[in-house]
Swiss-Prot record:
This is Dihydroxy-acid dehydratase. Its cofactor is [2Fe-2S] cluster; Mg(2+). Pfam families: ILV_EDD_C (PF24877), ILVD_EDD_N (PF00920). The gene is ilvD. Its EC number is 4.2.1.9. It comes from Trichlorobacter lovleyi (strain ATCC BAA-1151 / DSM 17278 / SZ). Belongs to the IlvD/Edd family. The keyword Oxidoreductase does not apply.
Length: 553
């Protein structure tokens, strides 16, 4: 075992002394040392329930014959970090998390890891660490929040009933009393936000990849099932250590294709593009951005999940969960290995009945193409991403007039002041991985568009990214970004822009000579942040089309 390097032999006498100082009995020294990387914090609703899960994981590890050792990992709530300086830090924490897990596991020669996670950047960071370390690992996602319920019985959810409600109030659609009801009911307790936002999409994809146990991706945070999964995961990691089953044995190219297909079938968050690219890179899997679009054209959307649809995570869990989606996708799923022991097709076959109102069959899809599309064109030579599952039919082909803003704050002010009108294309730039820095989510302006009733008449494009809660004609991840001199930096107010999602086009309708003249006049702006972690991050982060990862190159 790896841990023998710190606990066996004469020369390890000091190491054993230090281990015994933590309370480890001599009788436990022969057991596998299992690290539990816990991202518990009472700052985040998705993570406040983890103390209970930690206990069940620990019980499972000891039941399985291992010895549990806990260490902490930070977490950021994107909802709380939204709309201010804090959002600059969200995506960069993904890299920090991967680095921290790697550091602790290597420094202490842990035999295996249980990675307890839930929210947006924590789960991909944990998966990146697992792929990079390639020692036995299992993921436990803490589970989604229940939908809120008001006195009149209707369901409430975070994005629709907070960010969008704020804009509806500003527009006079609802009054202050109704807004307060929304605020009080949108988030009823612990768990990741209720819809198919980034956290829940990543939990589902983790299960699809084979890196968590069945139902882990959808079982609610408050459920007893989640605790049983935590216990079983603790037992399973000891088995994985003994059998030397490693993440790269599971996270193969075929497993990533399955994850993308499930993502597309459910209409998941566009952030998953960034994260899957980054995880695949750590796993040594070649996964070009174009893969998402190739698979989208042959994978129909089978579910209509909140925020664009009516179903919540609790509905998906009851309907059959990830195994139900695999079953409905049928032969489109490749038979791959999972940590659980059964293959993906065996897991699909284990589900007898699927609620076809929630997870439709291939013969009756919600839409004929998957939820995510990759666009190219003169604005995005290296690509841009849109969650087409959240775009109305009317806006799939749209030509509009550019209204340019060099930050999210400027765009948000224009929206709330009524400057943006039907027929406009809001361009938010210098918000990419380098230019932001940190590639902030544009949830506030996109929610404002919907709340103001502009979702069928105004498009938004950015080199930033979007929350999983975003819906509407919102195109992000535009590459190259403005800070690198990408074409998005050269757009001017009044330019005409063509958005053609069916033909995967995003074009600036300005002649080439004019564009080149503008390029000759363009100079890179001064960095927005010049000190601290973000200044270092901006120097080493790559473009969105490669996953916005940090490299030593």
């Amino acid at each position: 075992m790896r841990s023998d390097m710190i606990k066996k032999g004469l020369e390890r006498t000091p190491h054993r002394a230090l281990l015994k100082a933590t309370g480890i009995p001599q009788s436990q020294m022969e057991r596998p040392f299992i690290g539990v990387a816990t991202s518990f914090t009472d700052l985040i609703p998705g993570h406040v329930g983890m103390r209970d899960l930690e206990r069940f994981i620990e019980k499972g590890i000891h039941s399985g014959g291992g010895y549990a050792q806990f260490f902490g990992i930070p977490g950021v709530c994107d909802g709380i970090a939204m709309g201010h300086k804090g959002m600059h830090y969200s995506l960069p924490t993904r890299e920090l998390i991967a680095d921290m897990v790697e550091s602790v596991a290597e420094a202490h020669r842990l035999d295996g890891l249980v990675l307890l996670t839930n929210c947006d950047k924590i789960t991909p960071g944990m998966l990146m660490a697992a792929a990079r370390l390639n020692i036995p690992c299992i993921i436990v996602t803490a589970g989604p929040m229940m939908s809120g319920r008001g006195v009149e019985g209707r369901a409430y959810s975070f994005v629709t009933d907070t960010f969008e409600a704020m804009a509806r109030y500003k527009a006079g659609v609802i009054d202050a009393k109704e807004l307060q009801v929304c605020e009080d009911n949108a988030c009823p307790g612990m768990g990741s936000c209720q819809g198919l936002f980034t956290a829940n999409t990543m939990a589902i994809l983790t299960e699809t990849l084979g890196m968590s146990l069945p139902r882990c991706g959808t079982a609610l945070a408050v459920s007893a099932m989640k605790r049983r999964i935590a216990f079983a995961s603790g037992e399973k990691i000891v088995e994985l250590v003994h059998n030397d089953v490693k993440p790269r044995d599971i996270m193969t190219r075929a497993a990533f294709e399955n994850a993308i297909r499930v993502d597309l079938a459910l209409g998941g968050s566009s952030n998953t593009v960034l994260h899957l690219l980054a995880i695949a890179r750590e796993a040594g899997v070649d996964l070009p951005l174009e893969t998402f679009d190739i698979l989208a054209k042959e994978t129909p959307q089978l579910a209509s999940m909140n925020p664009a649809g009516k179903h919540f995570m609790e509905d998906l869990d009851i309907a059959g969960g990830v195994c139900g989606v695999l079953k409905q996708l049928g032969d489109k799923i490749i038979d791959t290995r999972t940590l659980f022991g059964l293959t993906t097709r065996q897991l699909a076959a284990s589900i007898e009945n699927v609620d076809q109102e929630v997870i439709r069959p291939l013969s009756a899809p919600v839409k004929k193409e998957g939820g995510i599309a990759v666009l190219f064109g003169s604005i995005a030579p290296k690509g841009a991403v849109v969650k087409q599952s959240g775009v109305s039919d009317k806006m799939m082909l749209f030509e509009g007039t550019a209204r340019c803003f060099d930050s999210e704050e400027l765009a948000m002010a224009a929206l709330m002041e009524g400057v943006i009108k039907a027929g406009d294309v809001v361009v938010i730039r210098y918000e990419g991985p380098k230019g932001g820095p940190g590639m902030r989510e544009m949830l506030a302006p996109t929610a404002a568009l919907m709340g103001l009733g502009l979702g069928d008449s105004v498009a938004l494009i950015t080199d930033g990214r979007f929350s999983g809660g975003t819906r509407g004609p919102c195109i992000g991840h535009v590459s190259p970004e403005a800070a690198e001199g990408g074409p998005i930096a050269l757009i001017q107010d009044g330019d005409r822009i063509l958005l053609d999602i069916p033909n995967r086009k995003l074009d600036l309708l300005v002649d080439g000579a004019t564009i080149e003249a503008r390029r000759a006049q363009w100079t890179a702006p001064e960095p927005k942040i010049k000190t601290g972690w973000l200044a270092r991050y901006a120097k080493v982060v790559t473009s969105a089309y490669t996953g916005a990862v940090t490299t030593a190159d």
